[in-house]
Amino acid sequence: MALSPNRSVTIKDVANHASVSVATVSAVMNKNKYVSPELAQRVRESITALSYKRNSFAHGLKTRVSYKIGLIVPDITNPFFTNIARGVEDVASAHNYSLILGNTDEDPEKEKKYLQLLESKQADGLIIAVTARSHEYLQSLPIQHLALISIDRSLFDLGIDTVMVDNRAGARTAIEHLIALGHRRIGLVTGIRGIAPTEERLLGYTEALEKHGIAVDPALIAVSYARVGGGERGAMQLLALENRPTALFMMDGTMAIGALQTIAKSGLRCPEDIALACFDDFTWAAVMQPRLTVIDQPTYEIGQQSAHLLFERLQNRKRAPREIRLQTQLIVRESCGAMLR
């Protein structure tokens, strides 16, 4: 099939090349009607052969979609959210969607500005890890046209699709592992209070202690924030206690780096003098000295699942909301002291 070099390839050209109707090409591209595998493959081969690229703007005018979705997270530099973003983007790209990314730093005002931006850009959907104080606030926002998915923070009680891990079980597993190693004074450094991950992990911590007959000591719980500096501050508070803990559990991987820095500055050794474990497993956790014992979260899968849910919601706005809870995994390395036994 010879085309003029100055003319753009059209959907009609693809249909002629594949010997199918324009409607069949459209169905294959939009994935909204059944097409036999043989015909679908023929269409895809013609699209590749002709280097056809759909005009998303023109298509959007016809279908009233923008081919844009938003992803709003507290901090994209946190590897937890970096991996989630990659999972979201891979699925979005497969659906020919672009991604608009925003960082809130847990600030409701910044969150509001990003939501207003998405409104102005007429985004079709939004995946969000809401700020600590924004549940009622979200209900009041003019975002009714957006398909909405919550990650890492539960909004299921508001009828919103949610994807997150079983934080309670993950924390309980970590604390029981430390107890099995002989620790009874286990310090906990939390993130911001009032958000689901913090509250659920705190509950898992207390459940594990109570199950083994260990009283919960409020002095062993330090409230901080999910950054390296937050880990330093929280660990410093706990190590300054007259009867300091023999083990620390950090609610975030970046906080564990800060904890290790504080342990070293205090003249202590990890794990010989104090054991350490944390949520989140990243590449550096396996190469640090000591290598970190972690509760691994399937971050890329969280991103994928949330994006899949979003596109399901775009196809069917009336379906019942779903909550997906993914499982965590304990990975035992050196920092907990298990290798010393």
Locate predicted features.
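Short beta-strand segments enriched in small/hydrophobic residues
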Residues: H17, V22-S26, L61-T77, H177, ...
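Short catalytic-loop micro-motif centered on adjacent basic/acidic residues
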Residues: I100-G102, I127-I128, L188, V294-D296
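Short gly/ser/thr-rich secondary-structure transition/capping motifs
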Residues: P5, A49-N55, E109, A129-T131, ...
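Short beta->alpha connector loops
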Residues: D105-P108, A129-S134, T254
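Amphipathic helical "hinge" segments at domain boundaries
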Residues: L50-L117, K121-G125, L203-T206, E210, ...
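Bacterial carbohydrate/catabolite-sensing allosteric modules
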Residues: M1-P5, A49, D90-H95, E119, ...
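N-terminal helix-turn-helix DNA-binding module of bacterial transcription factors
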Residues: M1-Y67
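Short acidic active-site motifs
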Residues: S56, K110-Y114, E136-Y137, G230, ...
